[in-house]
Every structure is written in C-alpha cells, then in structure tokens.
Amino acid sequence: MSTKEKLISHVMKEEPVGSRNKVTVVGVGMVGMASAISILIKDLGDELAMVDVMEDKLKGEVMDLQHGSLFLKTKIVGDKDYSVTANSKVVVVTAGARQQEGESRLNLVQRNVNIFKFIIPNIVKYSPNCILMVVSNPVDILTYVAWKLSGFPRHRVLGSGTNLDSARFRHLIGEKLHLHPSSCHAWIVGEHGDSSVPVWSGVNVAGVSLQNLNPQMGTEGDGENWKAIHKEVVDGAYEVIKLKGYTSWAIGMSVADLVESIIKNMHKVHPVSTLVQGMHGVKDEVFLSVPCVLGNSGLTDVIHMTLKAEEEKQVQKSAETLWGVQKELTL
C-alpha cells in the first residue's frame, strides 16, 4: 500500500465535472502575465489555462504561478498545445508581434493577422462556446480579425478597447479634483489609442455635469486646460513605455475587470470594442469602443450614447482610418 492509499480511502469514483469558470490567457508576455495575476488575485475562475508558442518562457511562468497555489483558489495549467484551453468560458488573447522601430502600422497589423490565423482556429476548436476577448494591439482591427476568423456571433467577440483609456481619464480627472476615480464618471470612446474620443459632455461627479459648470471644458478656449487631460491619457502609454519599456499592470487590471463582469454576469457597462456599423453614422464593418453591457452571454447590449456633432465626427473619422487599413488585409 502506498502512502496515499494508507492516508486516503475512496468513497466513490469521481467523475470529471469539468470547469465552469475556466479562463484562458493566450500569450505570456508582460500583458498576458499581468492579466493572469489580476484574474488570479480577483479569484475569478476555478481554472486558469495559459498558452504560448515560447515553451520555456511559458513553462517558467506557469511553474512560478503554481508555486503560489497555496495562496490562491484557482487551478493553474499551461501548455503550448491548445487542448489545455478546452472548455474555457472566456479566452483572453494578448499574443502578437511587437512593433519594430520604423515599422508601418499596416505591416504590424498584417504580421498580427498571420499570428491570429494560427491562434483563433485553435481557440474555436477547443472552446467553441467561449467569449473571445482581444487585447493585442491595434486592438480594434484585431478584434475585427478575430471576429472574422472565429465565425462567432458578434456578441461573443469583444476588444478591451477604451476600458483602460477611460480608467486613465477618470484617474486624471480625479487627481485634478482630489476625488476617487470611481466618483468621476467619464467616458472615452472610439479607437483605442491616438484618435480616441473623450466625451466631455458626459463628464460628471454625483450627476453634476462639469461642462454645465465650465461650458468651455475640453475646448481650446478653456482657461483651466482640461483638454490636456485627454492628451495625457493618449500620451500615458508612451510615457510608461519610455520609462519602463512596456505597459502591463493597468491593462492587466482592466482585463480582469472585464472578465469579472462576464463571469459574474454583472450586466456592468464598459467601453469596449464592438461592431459599430450603423451606429453614430459609421457605415463600414469596423470595431470601435462604445459603452456596452457585459454579462454571462458576452456583450449583450450597447448603450445609445448622446454624442455632440463634433464627437460623432471624430468617431466617424476613426472608423474611416480603420477601414482603410482593414480593407487591405488578407484574411
């Protein structure tokens, strides 16, 4: 008799139940690992699967996390074979090529499309009913690519979009007003990154519209220069990259925030990337961030945001830029 047999007596033969709240993270780079640790610490899944083509890095990261299993409630698994991801509820894609110096955005996009052509069919094969969350950049275009390659209905494919941009925005407004970001309600919509659109008309604290108090808010003529806050949101990522080489923690927390709303069926509203064709005057098949309701079925509803004509025009301009890139892609 083995030590185990002397210690434990079976009452019944256990049938594998399978995981109900399994989350997969594809890519164990800085963003993938920050997402993984955020998901683990928030206790969101009963199993976390990690997958990457770089076998040694993957093995090392998984072992490192597993060594902390005593302090967690989530089973951690990892393999370069996608079978490890089977039956996931949510799959978070953070993998992708890094932009090289002097590389055009279109070239980077096409390289990432080629990577997605391998990743997405593997996800679909093992988790045909999952909710697919794209984090890799440029996130709006790659969410469109993932949607096309997966064949999933649009409510099961979303991009992390401007969830982080809006968090940065609320943090900076909070700093200026000496308030906690959760008390500063503000939204950034449109494209994640340089051409994102701050909805100044919607910025409020306790229901008090800041634009009612300062009608010039967000414009060139504003003596308080609130416009600089949006510039800081856009430049924030570049600043962090310049200082530490990459961004990771805030995007990781942002991903966990979205995963939580899905797994816990919270029906919480987040600015995430979804198909916006037919909204705000957008004619093409593009994905941009608008306020969306997230729950157990995925992205169930879109909130009709009241945008000013100028804001709407910016969204349309973003859409045209994205479509210009998308129509050149070979899927």
Curated annotation (Swiss-Prot):
Q: Could you tell me what reaction this enzyme catalyses?
A: (S)-lactate + NAD(+) = pyruvate + NADH + H(+)
- Primary localization class, coarse: cytoplasm
Q: Which GO terms describe its biological process?
A: lactate metabolic process
Q: Where does NAD(+) bind?
A: 29-57, 98, 137
Protein's cellular compartments: Cytoplasm
Enzyme Commission number(s): 1.1.1.27
Ligand binding (substrate): R105, N137, R168, T247
Q: Which domain of life is it from?
A: Eukaryota
**A Pfam family recorded for this sequence:** Ldh_1_C
GO CC term, one of those recorded: cytoplasm
Function per UniProt: Interconverts simultaneously and stereospecifically pyruvate and lactate with concomitant interconversion of NADH and NAD(+).
Please give the family membership noted in the entry.
Belongs to the LDH/MDH superfamily. LDH family.
Cite the NCBIfam families for this sequence: L-LDH-NAD
> What is the recorded name of this protein?
L-lactate dehydrogenase A chain
Q: What species is this protein from?
A: Harpagifer antarcticus
